[in-house]
Amino acid sequence: MPSWWCCCCLVVLLYAQRMIVPSSAQNDGSDELQECPGGFCSPKYLCPNGTYNEANAQNQEIIMLRFGEEDVCQDYMQVCCSNATSMRYELVTNNEPVEYGCGISNPGGLIYQVEGNRTYAQYGEFPWVVAILEAFYSSNEQQFTYVGGGTLIHPRFVVTAAHIFNKTENLVASFGEWDMNRDENVYPKQNIDIDRTIIVHPEYNSVGLLNDIALAQLKQNVVYDKHIRPICLPNPTDRFDDQLCISTGWGIEALTSAYANVLKRVDLPVIARASCKKLFAETRLGPFFRLHKSVLCAGGEEGADMCDGDGGSGLACPNESGAYVLAGIVSWGLSCHQQNVPGAYVNVARFVTWINATIEGIL
């Protein structure tokens, strides 16, 4: 193996970390609602007359739901509702027709709104986003450790980065996830066990993170809905140079240096290979750095980057029809949010033939 790859492995920051997230058991509706002046704290979607004002919490960069100028509801996704005496948390039964085509986003989100701040995705905005979790039991209660991100491409398959899998037992794919601190959602999450056999690309190199791609096969099909839909795969010849794309995840945030609870979104330009090689050569990787053919570069703008905990998350680019295509998968980087230091993504177009052949061979 060339010596520069040994150097590279010492400085590369893997975009995969672990954190504990709450159990995904749904609220049974029996909890009492918190009182507030003139009513009760209630989810916005259940309250027709609650007040919703934008306020930016300086330290957390979270958009809060407020009653007038005072925070009266402890949960930032609730408002003070004057007629909520008999209301309880409930899930929406979706009777509207759902478009099942790939790459269809919900630009305004579904029900919840995080207004005036593009740091966070709207609820249900990117239906293909998947949280990969590891299940365990503590005090006889099921809990989850966050492993990394993934992208839904088929009712039975999630594509992600190979490097996030330290172990392959008790893994769960969580669909429809948005706020890691909330169990209640307007549309129900679907948690589906992942088969123990993670399908890693045969040429994956864990030292240099070459061909850093894997398929996670679900033990049962996920059910598509408004908030759960697949992304489109690119054609093998597709290029995304200079296109502005979107990456999402629950990794470290730029302003807080803490894990995101609400799904963050980062708008990132795709960088042409020649420019990317030049930028990396000006870093501590040095002038002899060679950019592997499996890597796509994006970012390089200060304060806009994916970071620890985002490994396996997708980079989605809109095509001419407005549908989103999976251009990249978060793989590695030298630092987070630094000017002129791009992030390294798996170039998905190079692996489309392998993805399709693998799925067809199994099914």
UniProtKB/Swiss-Prot annotation:
Residue stretches making up the Peptidase S1 domain: 114-360
Its subcellular locations are:
Secreted
Establish whether keyword Signal is in the entry: yes
Q: Which CDD domains match?
A: Tryp_SPc (cd00190)
Q: List the disulfide bonds in this chain.
A: 36-80, 41-73, 47-81, 245-317, 276-297, 307-336
Residues in the signal sequence: 1-25
Q: How is it modified after translation?
A: Secreted as a full-length protein. Proteolytically cleaved into two chains which remain covalently linked. Cleavage is induced by Gram-positive or Gram-negative bacteria infection.
Domain of life per record: Eukaryota
Q: Which Gene3D superfamilies match?
A: Trypsin-like serine proteases
**Which is a Gene Ontology cellular component entry for this protein?**
extracellular space
| A Gene Ontology molecular function term of the record | serine-type endopeptidase activity
Glycan-linked positions? 49, 83, 117, 166, 319, 356
Where do the Clip domain residues begin and end? 33-82
Q: Which family is this protein grouped under?
A: Belongs to the peptidase S1 family. CLIP subfamily.
- Domain comment in the entry: The clip domain consists of 35-55 residues which are 'knitted' together usually by 3 conserved disulfide bonds forming a clip-like compact structure.
Its function, per the record, reads: Inactive serine protease which plays an essential role in the innate immune response against bacteria, fungi and protozoa infection by activating the melanization cascade. In the melanization cascade, acts downstream of TEP1 and SPCLIP1 to promote CLIPA28 and CLIPC9 proteolytic cleavage and CLIPC9 recruitment to microbial surfaces. In the resistant strain L3-5, required for the melanization of killed parasite P.berghei ookinetes which results in their clearance. In the susceptible strain G3, appears to be dispensable for ookinete elimination which occurs by lysis.
Protein name from the UniProt record: Inactive CLIP domain-containing serine protease A8
